[in-house]
Amino acid sequence: MYVSTVEKKCLIVKLTEKVEDLSFINTLFSENCHHLILNLQEIELTNATLLSKFTTFGKKLVGTNSFVMVSTQFINKEWNIVPTLKEAFDIIELEDIERQLNF
């Protein structure tokens, strides 16, 4: 179903099968985690509605911190979907800088 790790104050959840309910991530997110990366590379994305639902969940969970999805099938800057994990960390770093500068 999923694999999770914490790296650089980011909870990284890699889905290994398609799910619609991400509420299980609430139990994985801790005070050691400021940001959430949802890795969707191993699942087939078939509709934008599901991605919109994931975005709403992720942004609500992290509050003012960063939420990024990783997928090579559906890249969308508006929803912070990038093709690699490295780019996800880059987005988080840029957003941290913007927050520090009050952008």
Kindly give the residue locations of the regions a language model identified.
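Amphipathic, Lys/Arg-enriched alpha-helical "gate/interface" segment within cytosolic domains
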Residues: 2-6, 12-103
